[in-house]
């Protein structure tokens, strides 16, 4: 993957049509509790893919499995054409959690730098990349601030920059904007779409917010109640930007709500 600030998508047209994550009969239990059952679908390289469903439908568990944090009990999945057990590119999978998880004893710059601590990049290369992503999310003037000195929206930008600094091929997001007010959440939606256009990375995000899924995603997987199964995958064939005042978007939102 090239520079995060590249003006051209990093994937060729052919690669953008291929599957970057493929799931086959994926299931997960916690003791006697079935959380996920027979998950079968594929996520295309370069797309924004949303997962919606009721609480307890296994959405976050699913993200934890494809991030490598949790192992499935049965079934399998492939990343970039390789079985998960043989995949060696986990450092290019970024995970943005619901909580920003900023370290209070680190400045904005040092929180972003945390993502590069276990890499072989030289000091100057690290500094250049950190400065680049801080500029990219519009926080240059706040680079030396402490987390308690910045707003919730800014904290989300720091968390996003920390994810981007590793130049991920896939960005996983678990309700990252759910704690923000409506205006700030809308701003972060625009920020995510802008960065997606710049980098061409694949984005997979979980949300309870049907409007958020409709505004951001190319496709939406609807998970059933526990055990989580894929009820349907819905294509969102709407041009961007998608405004909530648009009648076509409103109809898409109504359609998704009916499917949950």
Model-based region annotation:
Residues 52-54:
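The feature captures the beta-strand-to-loop junction immediately N-terminal to the Walker
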Residues 67:
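Helix-to-loop junction immediately C-terminal to a conserved catalytic motif
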Residues 146-150, 154:
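Conserved ABC ATPase signature
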Residues 82-97, 118, 123-127, 243-247:
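ABC ATPase NBD coupling module
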Residues 165-169:
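A short, proline-enriched helix->beta-strand linker immediately N-terminal to the Walker B motif
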Residues 124-142, 194:
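Conserved ABC ATPase "signature" region
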């Amino acid at each position: 993957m090239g520079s995060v600030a590249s003006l051209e998508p990093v994937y060729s047209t052919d690669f953008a049509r291929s599957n970057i994550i493929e799931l086959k009969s994926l299931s997960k239990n916690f003791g006697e509790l079935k959380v996920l059952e027979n998950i079968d679908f594929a996520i295309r390289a370069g797309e924004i893919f949303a997962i919606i469903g009721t609480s307890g439908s296994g959405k976050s568990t699913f993200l934890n499995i494809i991030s490598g944090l949790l192992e499935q009990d049965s079934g399998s999945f492939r990343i970039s054409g390789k079985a998960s057990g043989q995949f060696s590119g986990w450092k290019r999978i970024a995970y943005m959690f619901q909580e920003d998880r900023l370290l209070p004893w680190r400045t904005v710059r040092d929180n972003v730098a945390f993502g590069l601590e276990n890499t072989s990049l030289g000091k100057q290369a690290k500094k250049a990349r950190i400065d680049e992503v801080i500029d990219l999310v519009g926080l240059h003037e706040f680079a030396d601030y402490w987390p308690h000195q910045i707003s919730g929206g800014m904290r989300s930008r720091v968390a996003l920059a920390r994810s981007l600094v590793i130049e991920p091929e896939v960005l996983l997001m678990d309700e990252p904007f759910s704690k923000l007010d409506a205006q700030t959440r809308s701003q972060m939606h625009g920020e995510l779409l802008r960065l997606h256009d710049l980098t061409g990375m694949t984005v997979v995000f979980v949300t309870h917010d049907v409007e958020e899924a409709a505004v951001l995603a190319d496709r939406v997987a609807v998970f059933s109640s526990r055990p989580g199964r894929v009820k349907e995958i819905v294509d969102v064939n709407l041009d961007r930007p998608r405004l909530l005042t648009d009648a076509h978007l409103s109809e898409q939102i109504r359609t998704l709500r009916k499917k949950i």
